[in-house]
Curated annotation (Swiss-Prot):
GO cellular component: bacterial nucleoid
Coiled coil regions, renumbered to chain: none
Superkingdom of the organism of origin: Bacteria
Protein keywords: DNA damage, DNA recombination, DNA repair
High-level lineage: Bacteria, Pseudomonadati, Pseudomonadota, Alphaproteobacteria, Hyphomicrobiales
Protein name per its UniProtKB record: DNA repair protein RecO
Gene3D superfamilies: Nucleic acid-binding proteins (2.40.50.140), Recombination protein O, C-terminal domain (1.20.1440.120)
Gene Ontology terms: biological process: DNA recombination; double-strand break repair
NCBIfam families the UniProt entry points to: reco
Protein purpose: Involved in DNA repair and RecF pathway recombination.
Keyword DNA damage carried by entry: yes
Amino acid sequence: MEWRDEGIILGTRKHGETSAILEVMTRAHGRHLGLVRGGRSRKQQPVLQPGNRVDLLWRARLDEHLGTFQAEAIEMNAARLMDSAVAVYGLQTMAAHLRLLPERDAHGGLYEALSVMIVHLDDADAAGELVARFELLILDELGFGLDLSQCAATGTRQDLAYVSPKSGRAVSREAGAPWRDKMLALPAFLQRGSGLRADPAAVEDAFRLTGFFFTRHVYEPRAIEQPDARAGFLAALRKHHATRKAIAGDNAA
């Protein structure tokens, strides 16, 4: 068995004295693992870092075997990403979400989204919005996608302000007003075609929204905890926003 594909490295772990098990998200073969012989060498280690985009050759005697990878660098993103706590935790969060999907199942849309994320993840002002959108994509791929296109009660596409925790569908401000204390906030930037950027409060609302449905549909049924990286990502974002606010205050003074 043999195939060639490109992939983004999610992680590695040691195997024996000199080799490594490589975990990648590939364009056509989904999340895939393989053995890299000599993967702990000085030559290979810089290539096999999370966030790097690589050209992969996978070989195995049988399809169900772990197989071996040969990996060559296409884009060396790791050094840039490692300079940002937001980027490090963001990548770890997305990797944890991808592990919720069956190994070797192709998800081309997720690969394309991840490719975009890698380019912008070290921009802390954009990272929160990007990872929140990625979480919505993961929920959709898992079969628990939210319908944010129109009001569940009236069908209107205007002034959508809430999401029903029961149905996962958007609700307009007027229709949801009597139950607003029980509704989840729908940040405007998540609405298709809004063209709006996310402020810190909207980012918090977005992760509260996706976190609710991850807990209900994924974490609780599987008896697993939210990934630590997600909490680390949100903490890094809050620190970044607090620092920016403090700097802006000093400049204004």
